[in-house]
Amino acid sequence: MEDRTFKAKLVRYIDAGFPIIYINTFEEDKVDSLIPEISSGKEVYEWNETNGYIDFETKTPLQEDCTLERMLDQLKTPDLLDRKILIFKDITSYLDEPRIVSKVKGLARMINQGVDATVIIVSSVLVIPKDIEKYVTILEMDYLNTDEIKTIIRGFVKDNLNQQVDEN
């Protein structure tokens, strides 16, 4: 699948109001590069294990030591969730905790009832608790194909052909 097709699918799913989009990939940076293109003026926030609750664009923490549960608590009303895209990374280990699953389900239900928001889970490990299964749409991001790899290698060689090699 080419990036254009993946991106087009992601846009369609967001526009259609799919509450939770689970992007199964090892390439978090590739997903990050697409988000600004598809956010349609919505505020984008991220939660990850390392930095907590952060502004997606600047990658600066919005709160010190903000746990996933605390972030979810802050978005539990429609007016606080509206016009947002929430990116969750490093949360698969939390998806066996009933309190977390319940809060994620609450977000999904609000989105299903018309709140203009999307939850995007980015992970290389597919973990979907039964309680939120019906709200989740899985989107696979394929790896580079042979032609894409050749293009990257040619570009690298072209860019570096005239540079001196330091042999020390």
Residue ranges and their predicted role:
Residues 1-168:
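ATP/nucleotide-binding catalytic cores
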